[in-house]
């Protein structure tokens, strides 16, 4: 009821154990709600993060399995996030499923797609997923990075550190187009990434001659698997 009375409703997200906080606009009578601010908790208080991608990708993950970089958009801002996965044999009975910063039901759906469409047997394995930095991301375009990180951990094979990706996964294993692909690619290019996996449909209308980053279009999960792991 209170939300209908006031002009603006802001939601402050974060956890006391993480340094980053997100300020979202849920209702704004005088402007857009498609905006958000990212802040870092320091000893002297909250400070705005002007370039969240650089902070969220500050850790060196070269040669590490279970890590994939996604180009996400929250509000109107593109930024890159590190998706981490750990897959191990279930030695304590029922397999465990845990997701931090990502919807657990959606992760279970992606695991079912991997098992049904790609043939990876994950039903008897523990799967843990984490979005680095404590951020909660709702962008479906990080689906491709989620399954890539899971496959990387399951095979114990690292993804090249200069690879970034964006794509939504459908139930038949297709990689569906995502919105604002130019902004996602531009953010990855700005931070020095060399290859970008994207849905094949999104390649239409992009002037690849002006880009310094290699675009790798994929239609199915199987194609993304071959592009990443050979």
Indicate residue ranges for each PLM-predicted region.
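Peripheral, non-AAA+ core regions of ATP-driven protein-machinery
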Residues: 1-230
